[in-house]
Design a protein with these regions (language model features):
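All-alpha prenyltransferase/terpene-synthase fold signal
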Residues: 1-328
Length: 328
């Protein structure tokens, strides 16, 4: 776990960029329409740590030693796209809270929340048009949006089919979480005129960061001691089987596997959650997931070190480590 001092040091190289981003993000979430103003204000106060905009800025600095006006704009676009996707996810999942705050669909209704998500998405499009981003940057944003939709549809389909394969799990992760991390890294590189080879390396780096982030997020669902803005076992209740339990399913004896599947194929009650959390710990699912995070972390660090040495590279290395060690 990183100390508070190390976390503070990580903030220093990006402080000015993030301050500018936060001001731009706040301005973008404003409307004269009364029906929207309260909802947009709520989004401002319930936004997260802005991890994806940080990646945009760091990858720009990694490739060119500086950021540009397009870098800031790209960071705003990616965060607006991320925000819109979360609003729609909450509707799909019937979620009442996110990060400990009520969701828009809880405050209003599913119908209104969908339209509010569309408004935020349209705001991202307006930012793209107004800044005249390059065709390649437009393509990256559009592809990220498509991958988000594909990933969500895949997850819903797999949940209904009760399919439990690790390769399917990673396919969903790379399209949902990984899509925006990959796009963030690519946009950062493209915003400063990086070479095609640099853009590709940044994209792969972003994908690996997305995987590490999601696996760590999955572990939170199995830890009753963590306070991450959602109850323990929340994903299981929604029919989402993540890596800790997938590992157990794919290594269990036939009778035990059938028993686990029987729990997953019926409405999940408190006793069922306790059983599934316990079996994931006792059968090595938690340990396996932690090892996978370590492998992904090392691959990301090795890739990062293919870039020229710089203070930004050192910052990104600490940032990647923090993603795999964060507490929420």
């Amino acid at each position: 776990m990183m100390s508070q001092e190390e976390r503070a040091q990580l903030l220093v190289p990006r402080a000015d960029f993030i301050k500018e981003f936060e001001q731009a993000f706040k301005r973008s979430l404003q409307s004269d329409a009364p029906v929207l103003s309260h909802a947009l204000e709520h989004l401002q106060h319930s936004s997260g740590k802005h991890i994806r905009p940080i990646i945009v800025g760091l990858c720009a600095q990694l490739c060119a030693g500086q950021t540009s006006a397009q870098t800031l704009s790209a960071a705003l676009v990616i965060e607006l796209l991320h925000t819109a996707s979360l609003i729609h996810d909450d509707v799909i999942d019937w979620s009442d809270t996110r990060r400990g705050q009520p969701t828009l669909n809880a405050l209003y209704s599913n119908h209104q929340a969908v339209l509010m998500g569309d408004y935020v998405l349209s705001t991202a499009f307006l930012e793209i048009v107004s800044r005249e981003h390059t065709p390649e940057m437009l393509r990256v944003v559009a592809q990220a949006g498509r991958n988000l939709s594909i990933g969500e549809l895949m997850q819903l389909s797999l949940s209904k089919a009760h399919t439990y394969r690790e390769e399917d799990y990673y396919a969903v992760v790379d399209r949902k979480t990984g899509a925006l991390f990959e796009a963030s890294a690519k946009l950062g590189a493209l915003s400063v005129g990086a070479t095609e080879e640099q853009v590709d390396r940044c994209g792969r780096l972003g994908q690996l960061m997305g995987r590490a982030f999601q696996l760590q997020d999955d572990l939170f669902d199995y830890d009753k001691l963590q306070d991450v803005g959602k109850p323990t076992g929340h994903d299981l209740v929604e029919g989402k089987v993540s890596l800790p339990l997938l590992y157990v399913l794919n290594h269990a004896a036939p009778t035990e596997r059938d028993e686990i599947i029987s729990y997953l194929q019926q409405p999940i009650e408190a006793d069922s959650i306790d059983y599934l959390l316990r079996i994931a710990r006792e059968r090595g699912g938690i340990d396996y997931t932690e090892r996978q995070i370590q492998h992904i972390h090392q691959e990301a660090i090795d890739l990062l070190r293919s870039f020229a040495p710089s203070s930004t590279r050192e910052t990104l290395e600490r940032f990647i480590t923090l993603l795999g060690e964060r507490q929420k």
